[in-house]
Swiss-Prot record:
The protein, known as: Motile sperm domain-containing protein 3
Main location: membrane
Tissue expression notes: Detected in heart, kidney, liver, spleen and brain.
GO biological process: heart development
Coiled-coil residue spans: none
Membrane topology: Multi-pass membrane protein
Key word rRNA-binding present: no
Span of domain MSP: 33-145
The encoding gene: Mospd3
Disordered, as annotated region: 1-31
Length: 235
């Protein structure tokens, strides 16, 4: 066998019906383009959920097509839905899992073949496409996985910039509390002043008419004063 020639392929996945053949060229007639994504499969041995890839198969025609997935190394892979049907103008996702992620299989290229045929048990093959598959080694050696990388010695700490920063952080809540207290105190003084002012219809007051307030304003001032009292009591 010449180098690079495809080997006999088998269906992979649950319920595979046995060995397939290399297959003769498609019969005369329209040839359907086999549209798959991604065009190549790259598995990573350090994937948490296990080396797996999602292969999407598209059917651009107006009729349903039967598909099947073959592989040159069926013992290394599990294909969910290795054969079935693709609806017209639709697509289907095929999950392919590498079940033998051992070092001897790193960087070894395998080959998958996607065959499309007409609907029916004796449907003729109308399209096929070969895609390569490769298993990549982990990004880090296995003995280093699960261990944190050693951190370099940070050296002596720099105290020059730390002291002012800590001082500002400690003083910030105190400044905020002081400003809030002054704001509450000012609002309380204004509310008390509104309560002491005479009503608009009150007679005999020596204050000018502009300083007379309405009953509604006094009620609002009393409400605000009550809220401030509750806040101060809780703090």
């Amino acid at each position: 066998m010449r180098r690079g020639a495809p080997q006999d392929q088998e269906l992979v996945g649950p319920g595979a019906p046995g060995r397939g053949s290399r297959g003769s060229p498609p019969s005369s007639g329209p040839v359907v383009p086999v549209l798959v994504f991604p065009p190549d499969l790259v598995f990573r041995a350090d994937q948490r959920s296990g080396p797996r890839q999602l292969l999407t198969l598209y059917n651009p025609t107006g009729t349903a097509l039967r598909f099947r997935v073959l592989c040159t190394a069926p013992a290394k892979y599990t294909v969910f839905d290795a054969e079935g049907y693709v609806k017209p103008q639709s697509c289907i996702d095929i999950v392919i899992r590498h079940v033998a992620p051992v070092p001897s299989h790193y960087d070894v290229q395998d080959r998958f073949r996607i065959e499309l045929s007409e609907e029916g048990t004796e449907g003729r093959v109308v399209g096929r496409k070969d895609i390569t598959s490769v298993l990549r080694a982990p990004a880090y050696p296995l003995e280093l996985q699960g261990h944190s990388e050693p951190t370099p010695n940070p050296g002596p700490p720099v105290w020059t910039g730390l002291t002012p920063a800590r001082h500002l952080q400690e003083n910030a809540p105190q400044q905020l509390a002081t400003s809030s207290f002054l704001l509450f105190l000012l609002a309380g003084v204004i509310s008390v002043a509104f309560l002491l002012l005479p009503l608009q219809d009150e007679l005999g007051s020596q204050l000018p008419q502009v300083l007379h307030v309405s009953l509604g304003q006094k009620l609002v001032a009393a409400y605000v004063l009550g809220l401030l009292t509750m806040v101060l009591l809780r703090t």
